[in-house]
Design a protein with these regions (language model features):
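Short acidic active-site motifs
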Residues: 90-94, 109, 154
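Hydrophobic/aromatic beta-strand patches that form the interior of the parallel beta-sheet core
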Residues: 8, 65, 84-86, 101-103, ...
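A nucleotide-sugar donor-handling region in carbohydrate enzymes
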Residues: 1-45, 69
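Catalytic binding pocket for nucleotide-activated donors in carbohydrate/polymer assembly enzymes
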Residues: 110-157
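C-terminal alpha-helical cap of glycosyltransferases
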Residues: 181-198
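Acidic donor-binding loop of glycosyltransferase active sites
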Residues: 97-108
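Donor-nucleotide binding loops and adjacent catalytic segments primarily
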Residues: 29-99
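A short, well-ordered alpha-helix in the C-terminal region of glycosyltransferases
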Residues: 168-182
Length: 198
């Protein structure tokens, strides 16, 4: 916790109720067959497009699901990927459970991915996201820093490296599950009420 009036950390992140009943991914396969690309409601830095181009550059042949927020511009262009573009996803948790790896910014989505155990590469959208303390390797995330400063070649190398390294993906999965093992909305509400003296 930070100060006397705040509850912080992954353990205190309230998630959509649908995440409370999802199976947590306990086993990581040798291969990556499905990559999830999600960069928030507006994606002001164009990180989804950068991620898709990097996946294309490494010749990724599995399925790619790119989720665009309602405020994000349409991504135009042809991609040499098995790509589905999604908008206004009703059950994000169910989609996340099917992913072997995710590319995301450092907002709440990271905590959702951690709660399921999805190994994640993080690209921060802005300076504020760089201050988020939950997007760390100890929580199951490879944080590349400010996305706008990452070259396409470096992003492609990071993705290719994680795809090839099943041991690292298993380590990230275990770290994510451990970091969120005690997290539940009911426990968070209880802590808030205890904190307020109810």
């Amino acid at each position: 916790s930070l100060g006397d009036n705040q509850l912080t950390s992954v353990e205190n992140a309230v998630l959509a109720p649908s995440f409370e009943s999802l199976s947590r991914t306990a086993a990581i396969g040798k291969d990556v067959n499905h990559v999830l690309v999600l960069f928030g409601g507006t994606d002001p830095s164009g990180l989804a497009l950068s991620s898709l181009r990097a996946l294309e550059d490494i010749g990724f042949t599995g399925k790619v699901s790119c989720v665009r927020g309602l405020g994000a511009s349409q991504i135009e262009g042809d991609f040499k990927l098995d790509l589905e573009m999604l908008r206004d996803v009703k059950n994000m948790g169910a989609l996340m459970v099917s992913a072997d790896l995710a590319l995301s910014s450092a907002g709440r989505t990271i905590t959702e991915l951690l709660s399921i155990g999805v190994p994640t590469i993080c690209l921060a959208q802005n300076q504020k996201e760089l201050t988020h303390t939950h997007a760390t390797k100890s929580n199951g995330v490879i944080n590349l820093g400010l996305g706008s400063l990452i070259s396409k070649a470096d992003l492609a190398a990071a993705i290719a490296g994680l795809i090839k390294d099943s041991a690292l993906r298993a380590e990230l999965n275990a770290a994510a599950l451990a970091a969120t093992a005690k997290r539940s909305n009911a426990q968070i509400v209880k802590r808030i009420f205890d904190f307020l003296g109810f």
